[in-house]
Amino acid sequence: MLPGYMASATEIIAEGRQARAGGDLAAARSRYAAAAKIYRDRNDVLAYAHTIRHVADIYQQESNSGEAKPLYEESIELYRSNLNTKILDLANALRPYALLNEAQGNLELASKLWEEARQLYSSLRVQPGVFECDEHIRKLQQL
C-alpha cells in the first residue's frame, strides 16, 4: 500500500472475504467491521446494513450469538426503513436471524421470521430459499 493511501470499503471487504475463506474469522470480522465503519461514516445505510449482517454472520460462525443478535436486528431495521432496500437483502438478513432465534428457543419469533423470509424468497422465485424456509416452518409447527 502506498504511503497515505487509505483502502476503500470494497477493498477492506475483499480482505475480509479472503480471511474468512482462509478460516481466520477474527481477521475477517475485523475487516468487515472496519468497512462497516466507513459506510456508517459516509451515511451509506444499505451498504452499512449489508456489511454488519456479514459481521453478525461471522459472530454466529464463532458461536457468539450475543454479539450477532443486535447486529442482525439493526441490519433488518435499516433494511425495513429504507425504500431502496433490495428484497433479497432483507430476506438474506431475516434467514440467519431466524436461525439464531430458533437455536435460542425463541420459536414464535423464529417462525414469524421464516414466514416473512419465505414470502420474500417466493416473490423473487428463489426456490432454494423457499424450500429452506418451508423446512424450518414445518419443523417448528411440529414442536
Functional labels for PLM-detected ranges:
Residues 5-41:
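Alpha-helical segment of the N-proximal tetratricopeptide repeat
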Residues 19, 39, 79-81, 101, ...:
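Eukaryotic all-alpha helical interaction scaffolds
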Residues 10-11, 50, 89-92, 112, ...:
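Residue register of alpha-helical TPR repeats
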Residues 6-7, 46, 88, 128:
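Residue signature of alpha-solenoid helical repeat architecture, marking inter-repeat boundaries
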Residues 3-4, 43, 85, 125:
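Structural signature of alpha-solenoid helical repeat scaffolds
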